[in-house]
A protein has these predicted regions:
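Active-site acidic/histidine proton-transfer and metal-coordination neighborhood
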Residues: 16-17, 57-58, 75-180, 190
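Transmembrane beta-strand segments of Gram-negative outer membrane beta-barrel proteins
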Residues: 1-3, 61-64
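Glycine-rich, proline-tolerant flexible connector loops at the mouths of alpha/beta enzymes
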Residues: 33-53, 113, 117
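Catalytic-core regions built around general acid/base machinery
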Residues: 48-58, 132-140, 198, 229-233
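Histidine-acidic metal/acid-base catalytic patches
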Residues: 1-4, 9-28, 89, 93, ...
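Conserved alpha-helical segments that form or flank metal/cofactor-binding pockets of metalloenzymes
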Residues: 55, 64-66
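Active-site-proximal loop/turn and secondary-structure-junction residues that shape catalytic pockets
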Residues: 9-11, 34-36, 69-72, 113-115, ...
């Protein structure tokens, strides 16, 4: 298991202090929201990309995953029209290329509002999603990356693929080496999933994992998420991928300590 943390957990102004703390703690991997770095990441130059990679290398940290690709594009939709779907697919394909350039082998597709199906039947949505992700899986393989589908709970305004079982069924139906399953502790807890069973039933397709709390609250020992069940299940399936802490930042100036506390808690439970 490789421990990472997402860069959404601090402000840009705190990044150097957080990076130094992560180096001190021996955290060697980071997940990034590219939209936090560049206004349009798909237009980042190779010079900008290399500069960012090298900046983290100074702290012995490697970029291993992307998230929040559609954060700045609420206009892009999977199910609204074929034109918007094509535009969404191309935009995500550009992120797959960027991930390949940056050495990030996993991209988390959450984006609950971009995949709302509304009145569309589940069967029709499944048919569209299968073709949509199959094509992106081919692109992912081209760039030695993998797009990981994240079941998102209804509390996050998601109405398509809201449980771990639904996510697993879609990934198995797509059956692409470029598409994997991503699970998230908060999403599973909110959706009422059996966390242990969801992980153990899907060890063969589980390719990325988030340790989070509902509404991206601070990660600590809490009653609403069974982190110990998740940790035990990951050990049972001999999970060797990335486990990434995902939480929103607190007040400016307090996030170095929040990151340190979260890393300490997660290591105590998951390692």
């Amino acid at each position: 298991m490789k421990l990472a943390i997402s860069n959404i957990a601090w402000t840009n102004e705190e990044e150097a202090d957080v990076a130094a703390k992560l180096q001190e703690l021996g955290v060697r991997y980071i997940e990034i929201a590219p939209t936090k770095i560049w206004s349009d990441p798909t237009k980042a130059t190779i010079e900008q990309i290399n500069e960012y990679i090298e900046w983290w290398k100074k702290y012995d940290i490697e970029i291993v995953a992307f998230q929040s690709m559609l954060f700045a594009r609420p206009d892009l939709k999977m199910f609204e029209s074929s034109e918007l779907r094509d535009e969404t697919r191309q935009y995500l394909a550009d992120f797959l290329r960027l991930a390949g350039d940056m050495g990030a082998s996993r991209l988390v597709f959450g984006s609950p509002k971009n995949r709302q199906r509304g009145r569309m039947s589940t069967e029709e949505a499944d048919d569209i999603a299968n073709r949509f992700f199959s094509e992106l899986g081919d692109v992912a393989k081209q760039y030695n990356t993998m797009l990981c589908i994240e079941p998102n709970a209804p509390q996050y305004n998601c109405d398509y693929i809201t449980t771990a079982d639904e996510g697993a069924r879609l990934v198995r139906a797509i059956s692409s080496e470029g598409i994997g399953l991503h699970l998230d502790t908060a999403c599973m807890a909110l959706a009422g999933d059996d966390i242990s069973k969801s992980i153990q039933d899907n060890g063969d397709i589980l390719k990325h994992f988030h340790i989070s709390a509902p509404m991206l609250d601070r990660v600590y020992d809490r009653d609403d998420v069974d982190y110990r069940a998740a940790a035990d299940a990951l050990k049972r399936i001999d999970y060797s991928g990335v486990v990434s802490i995902e939480m929103r930042p607190g007040e400016h100036g307090e996030n170095v300590k929040r990151v340190e506390d979260a890393v300490s808690f997660v290591r105590n439970i998951f390692e």
